């Protein structure tokens, strides 16, 4: 994940994205049954986000891990999750629940390119009331 050259660096010398990659690696290395991921890809650049998100997605599927993913990214929620829960503004309440039915054996790019992905994205966008 581009960290090899920084093996002897202090954490203060790492970028936010590097620290986030270290945190993800450390979490996955412990092989937990449940992953609690709070904005795990937010500090990553677009290309790195896609690569690491795809890697984590494959690991989670292969090892049958349960994941609770907190994200502000509709895209991440749809391509990564089996279920998306949309919350209202404060005080947070469940606004809608989506059972995501995309091909589980596909990679995240294939999931993103499906027609169903676009339908989910548009529905979730409407739930967020951001157009008003």
What kind of region is each of these model predictions?
Residues 9-12, 30:
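Conserved signature/switch motifs of ABC ATPase nucleotide-binding domains
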Residues 79-86:
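Conserved catalytic segment of ABC-fold P-loop ATPases
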Residues 1-6, 58:
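Conserved ABC ATPase "signature" region
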Residues 35-38:
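Catalytic Walker B motif of ABC-type/P-loop ATPase nucleotide-binding domains
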Residues 64-70:
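Conserved H-loop
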Residues 49-63:
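Helical segment within the ABC ATPase nucleotide-binding domain
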């Amino acid at each position: 994940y581009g960290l090899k050259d920084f093996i002897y660096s202090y954490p203060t010398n790492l970028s936010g994205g590097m620290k986030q990659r270290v945190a993800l690696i450390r979490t996955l290395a412990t092989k937990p049954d449940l992953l609690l991921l709070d904005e795990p890809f937010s500090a990553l650049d677009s290309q790195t986000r896609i690569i690491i998100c795809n890697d984590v997605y494959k690991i989670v599927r292969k090892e049958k891990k349960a994941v609770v993913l907190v994200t502000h990214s509709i895209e991440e929620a749809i391509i990564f999750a089996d279920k998306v829960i949309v919350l209202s503004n404060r005080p947070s309440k469940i606004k809608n629940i989506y059972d995501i039915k995309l091909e589980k054996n596909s990679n995240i790019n294939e999931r993103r390119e499906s027609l169903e992905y676009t339908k989910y994205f548009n529905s979730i966008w409407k739930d967020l009331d951001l157009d008003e």
